[in-house]
Amino acid sequence: QGIWNDKLFPSWDSKYTCNINLEMNYWPSEVTNLSDLNEPLFRLIKEVSESGKETARIMYGANGWVLHHNTDIWRITGALDKAPSGMWPSGGAWLCRHLWERYLYTGDTEFLRSVYPILKGSGLFFDEIMVKEPVHNWLVVCPSNSPENVHSGNDGKATTAAGCTMDNQLIFD
């Protein structure tokens, strides 16, 4: 994809897939002392944290910001494509982990101060949209899904769920 794409209609529309693909490309950067390579990712995170405010407000009636499964050069943040992947609202939370990793590796408090509004906005979104699970009263993200995973439902296959483990871990982080 990117400059290597020779297709008029490329796979995934050449979007950034934020349910592991984009994140995985940057995992080695801090641990290999190549922190500067994160700058394009950090710019993307800042931009989707801005466009994601509108998505949070319109789709969820919530403050903060949200990024679903994909974004692109226009920094779209809403649910798109198919339900097994597109309805997942935790792409922004996962990308925030990269901001936190930068701080953990560098101890740069100025950097942390500069990205704190982004981290806070993602947390605020989840604080406002989580609901109580009816049996145990746990707070869970709903609706959600485990991206690209289809599970057995009452009447066949289902994708939308409440309290997916992936969401729980990302919010915990």
Question: Which residue stretches match the model-derived regions?
Answer:
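Alpha-helical scaffold segments in carbohydrate-active enzymes
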Residues: 44-47, 51, 118-129
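Substrate-binding groove/exosite segments of carbohydrate-active enzymes
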Residues: 1-114
